[in-house]
Structures are given as structure tokens and as C-alpha cells.
């Protein structure tokens, strides 16, 4: 790694860390680029050479969080996959809780898209067989919103439960177990 690469990495890390720190203190909408650059100790032009806006910084944060989160092995069980997702959220809860609890629209929309794409297909067939008269769009909405609410509850109040227990609660509510 060249010294320039290290400087770029160090600068991006400082901006990212400052942004996360601010997200833990206040909601996204009230954070200014000025606050980010002050806390990161970088210049405005430096910030804008890395990110066009705080929204694109948030987008990168979401992509970073979701990249490993939703990766899965070929023949993994639904329970094991969901346990992996909950474990990942717990491991990254410093980054996630502020976005989740602030009800940040962008973060929630991205999370919903990922859940619709990765989680819903794993439970769709069983739900459609069990509830053939319920529209697919409703079932998808039910699976996704219940996942987000279960995650929110667990991170706020249910920390005494292990990931696999929370997955059991979630699947029991979906009547998948």
C-alpha cells in the first residue's frame, strides 16, 4: 500500500468514524457536513473529494453493513441464515442502532429491499402454502416488517436472548416452526 493509499484510507476512516459518532448522538437529517468535517478533522474539499454528500456517505455505510450481512452459503437452513443475520446486526449494533432507532427513511428502505430480496424468498413457499388466499404483497410486507420490529425489540429490550432464540421467536410468529 502506498503512502497516498494510506492517507486516503485514514481520511475515509476518520470521516466514517465521525459520521457514526454523530449518528449515535443525533438523527441523520440534523447532521451537517460541517459537523462531520469538524469531528473528522478534515477540510471541506477533502470531504467532497471522497463523498459528494452526506447522503452518499450514508449510502456507502448501508452498502458496507449489508454486504456481508446478506451473503449466504448455498444450502444453509432458514434458521442458520437468520441467526447469521441477527449475529451480524449484533456485531455491528453501534452502526445499526442509531440508524434503526432513528427510523431513518433511507436506511429502512434499503433494509426492506434487502430483506425482501434475501429473507422473504426463504419463507415464501411455506407461507403461500399455509395462506393461499392472502396476497403475496401482504405476506412479503408482513415478513419484512416483522423482521425489522423483531430486530428493533431485540436490540432495545431483548438482549438477554441469544440470536437463535430470537430467530425461533420470529419464525414462531410466522408459524414457520
Please place each PLM-identified region on the residue numbering:
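Amphipathic alpha-helical linker/stalk segments
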Residues: 21-24, 31, 61-85, 96-97
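Helical hydrophobic small-molecule/effector-binding pocket
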Residues: 77-123
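C-terminal peripheral helix-coil segments that are non-catalytic and often amphipathic
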Residues: 87, 153-177
Amino acid at each position: 500500500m502506498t503512502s497516498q493509499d494510506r492517507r486516503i484510507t485514514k481520511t475515509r476512516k476518520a470521516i466514517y468514524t465521525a459520521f457514526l459518532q454523530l449518528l449515535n448522538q443525533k438523527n441523520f437529517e440534523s447532521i451537517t457536513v460541517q459537523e462531520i468535517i469538524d469531528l473528522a478533522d478534515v477540510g471541506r474539499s477533502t470531504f467532497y473529494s471522497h463523498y459528494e454528500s452526506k447522503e452518499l456517505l450514508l449510502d456507502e455505510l448501508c452498502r458496507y453493513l449489508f454486504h456481508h450481512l446478506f451473503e449466504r452459503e448455498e444450502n444453509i437452513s432458514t434458521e442458520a441464515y437468520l441467526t447469521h443475520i441477527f449475529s451480524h446486526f449484533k456485531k455491528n449494533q453501534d452502526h445499526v442502532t442509531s440508524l434503526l432507532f432513528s427510523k431513518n427513511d433511507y436506511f429502512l428502505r434499503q433494509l426492506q429491499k434487502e430483506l425482501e430480496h434475501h429473507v422473504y424468498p426463504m419463507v415464501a413457499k411455506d407461507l403461500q402454502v399455509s395462506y393461499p388466499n392472502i396476497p403475496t404483497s401482504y405476506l412479503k410486507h408482513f415478513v419484512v416488517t416483522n423482521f425489522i420490529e423483531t430486530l428493533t425489540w431485540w436490540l432495545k429490550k431483548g438482549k438477554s436472548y441469544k440470536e437463535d432464540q430470537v430467530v425461533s421467536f420470529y419464525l414462531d410468529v410466522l408459524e414457520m416452526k
